[in-house]
UniProtKB/Swiss-Prot annotation:
Described purpose of this protein according to its UniProt entry: This is an intracellular thiol proteinase inhibitor.
Swiss-Prot/TrEMBL site (Reactive site) positions: G10
Chief localisation class: cytoplasm
Protein origin, superkingdom: Eukaryota
Organism taxonomic ancestry: Eukaryota, Metazoa, Chordata, Craniata, Vertebrata
Protein name: Cystatin-A1
InterPro entries named among the record's database cross-references: Cystatin_dom, Cystatin_sf, Prot_inh_cystat_CS, Prot_inh_stefin
Subcellular location: Cytoplasm
Gene Ontology CC: one annotated term: cytosol
Motif Secondary area of contact boundaries: 51-55
Length: 103
């Protein structure tokens, strides 16, 4: 099976963030700021992995300034469900070299 195809439940290989991934990250930025009680001046999606579930989980590495990164998990429901994007998990105090993993 090619690495760029998604297997249900499996994580894809890490890929450079696209404008769509940046938009997803930006959409849940306020949810993350509320949960971490921090304001992120910089919020630049760098890379991502995705996972097909009953919708799609996006694991996104976000550069938040200096040497600081956060990993966010965003759930995108199936189109017919018409639900907003949900920040379903996050990891703070990450570095540029920390690998994105399922969490």
């Amino acid at each position: 099976m090619e690495s760029d195809k998604m297997m249900p439940g499996g994580l894809t290989e890490a890929r450079p963030a696209t404008p769509e991934i940046q938009e997803i990250a930006t959409t849940v930025k306020s949810q993350l700021e509320e949960k971490t009680n921090k304001t992120y001046e910089k919020f630049e999606a760098v890379e991502y992995k995705s996972q097909v579930v009953a919708g799609i989980n996006y694991y996104i590495k976000v550069h938040v300034g200096g040497n600081s990164y956060v990993h966010i998990k965003v759930f995108k429901s199936l189109p017919y469900q018409n639900k907003p994007l949900e920040l379903s998990g996050y990891q703070v105090d990450k570095t540029k070299d920390d690998e994105l993993t399922g969490f």
